[in-house]
Amino acid sequence: MKILLTNDDGVQGLGMLKLAEYLKDKYKVTVVAPEKERSAISHAITLHKPLRLKKVKEEDSLKIYAINGTPSDCVKLGIEVVLREKPDIVISGINEGLNLGTDILYSGTVSAAIEAAIYGIPAIAVSRAETADIEDRRIYKFLENLIEKVLEKGLPKNTLLNVNIPDFKKGIKGVKATILGKSIYIETFQKNYDPRGKEYYWMAGKISEIEKDERTDIVSVKEGYISITPIHFDLTEYNMINILNSWDIKIE
């Protein structure tokens, strides 16, 4: 079995490298990751400069490459150039920091898994609480079990899994299938000036609404569950199709 691993934390991302080392005893693992951190870049791809591929490490069952691109670039290049065939599964992560609710729309981690789903490849995006112990082998055993289930059962077309792992030290209640919550922020921008007197802004902000629906990934992780959310990239609101047609919008 061949696994393609990527992330948005960069090729030195500890979570991804630890997972690669764990999986290499059972699978052929190829890592293709950004050469530097590309967090919150969503599904961006590189069109206006060349992509450069660098081999970082090569063993019998583990190869690591870095590219000067985005997480989605990594999946494309990994499939088309490095592997030259589709892997059995693509794993994006383990990301340092959770990817919950509508925050996934900004996530390079989740977008890399979406890119794999566009290719028709089973994919899992994995994120962990920043306080979670990256050395805890239970994290990797859980992911190994999940990978085996996905390879055995398959996933529906255009569907991937978004997994969020809380801090095991605080106690884990179990694994829970969830829906996406809503992450609503009050956006603020901190204004400052550079040494030449030109203004610039830092984006800040805070959560304005606390999600309370127990079915959601946000609440489930907060309560101590590993959250698995099935998501797909078809953003169509099908219930709106007939409504739009009924508007009878004229061209002239």
Curated annotation (Swiss-Prot):
EC number(s) stated in the UniProt entry for this protein: 3.1.3.5
InterPro entries per record: SurE (IPR030048), SurE-like_Pase/nucleotidase (IPR002828), SurE-like_sf (IPR036523)
Keywords: Cytoplasm, Hydrolase, Metal-binding, Nucleotide-binding
Xref: SUPFAM superfamilies: SurE-like (SSF64167)
A single cellular component GO annotation: cytoplasm
Co-factor binding comment: Binds 1 divalent metal cation per subunit.
Protein name per the record: 5'-nucleotidase SurE
Phylogenetic classification of the source organism: Bacteria, Bacillati, Bacillota, Clostridia, Thermoanaerobacterales
